[in-house]
Amino acid sequence: MNAKVKITNRAGASFPVRRMNFNFENVPEYWMNGSAGLTHFMTALSALFPAGEQFFIDSVRAVRYHPAIKENEVLQKEISAFIGQEAMHTQEHVGFNASAQKYGHDVARLEQQTDIVIQGFRKTAAMLFKPVGVTQEMIDLMGTTALEHFTATIASQLLINRHIQELMTDETMSTMWYWHAIEENEHKAVAYDVFEGVFGTGVKAYLARCGSLIAAMATLFVVQSYFVLRLLKQDNQLNLKALKDIYVYGYSPSKGIITGMGREMLAYFKPGFHPNHLDTVSLLANWKAKLGL
């Protein structure tokens, strides 16, 4: 593994914080099977993470000492470990994004635009829903729980889909994405448990979380697609081959990472849903053993 790993569990949570230190210096420009399309698809995702992960952390921190959950010692430990993992994800994606920048890909600009989109989404949602009693804290947690469900689901696909794994031809990058995927599934229930602990499980909370998933997925699709096209155009790689590679990787019925997410994404709309109903325990155990995590 091209990373120095330090594993700690000071919080005593059900999962540890792994302090990674990947070296991206020798990552090739088109690190994913030599394909500009595939590489820029994943780089566009990576550009979302620094601002996105910080939003998740801020959303959970804002309510962690709410009277309804502040005495819940188990959940408080999970929150601390969640924050630690998300902070490490931010650090490593910032490192990779900077390495992509050296090839002339303006990922820094995409990181800035991600934050602009998040803040605009927050303000728009507040304008629409505060008059009916939805607080900013609830809006932020709605978005966080929805996006955490997406990240955990796409992460599990990355760990399941052999076709996708075969395309991850650079060891440093594949290890980074597999590590990130493992941790997204380890902490997939934390923001959800915070949301339910603070805002309950009634009809209002159910409608809020379902509506937020629809809005978040629509926004995410538009933003990530724009980022991909921008990266391809800047790189003079906006061509049929790149778009075909992206289609097969992301959206083909039999192999696509996005199309493979359908059942798990729809499960979010079930009354009584909980992220842990989507069992990935054995999957994670196998991958942690494989990577020495």
Task: Give the location of each predicted region.
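Non-heme di-metal
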Residues: N2-L293
